[in-house]
Amino acid sequence: MLRRIALLPLAAAALVVCGPNPKSRELRLWSDNYAFYITMDPMPPRALEPITYRVVVQDKKTRQPIETGEGRIFATSADRANTSDGFKKEKELGTYSGRLFFATTGDWAAAIQFRRDKDPRLPLERVDWIQTVHTASEPGT
């Protein structure tokens, strides 16, 4: 009996190590010149809660992080509700963040626009995806 109790912490540690890989929840998108690695918190996104998107941007060919870029994240629902935010530079190399607030559940057409420098003459590159938004959490949970 004591042997089984002693093995419980090892079993719990094994579950943590073998748990879901954070990379498996990462959305990966590519434009002509950039690779975007997108995570969101909380996951899955829920209506009526602010969702923070963290976006790592790399040069598609060299895999180097893009440090001086600018961009935005935005989404539109089927009933034309909109949400958007400009990117804020984070401490990590090539990492930006933006927050979206989804007013309704369902599928939203989401997109990122981004350019390497803050030069308005440079074109904005765009990637699109469908973001499924789940029902809001119950109050107090």
Task: Go through the PLM ranges and name each one.
Residues M1-V16:
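Sec-dependent bacterial lipoprotein signal peptides
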Residues C18-T141:
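N-terminal soluble domains immediately following signal/targeting peptides that reside
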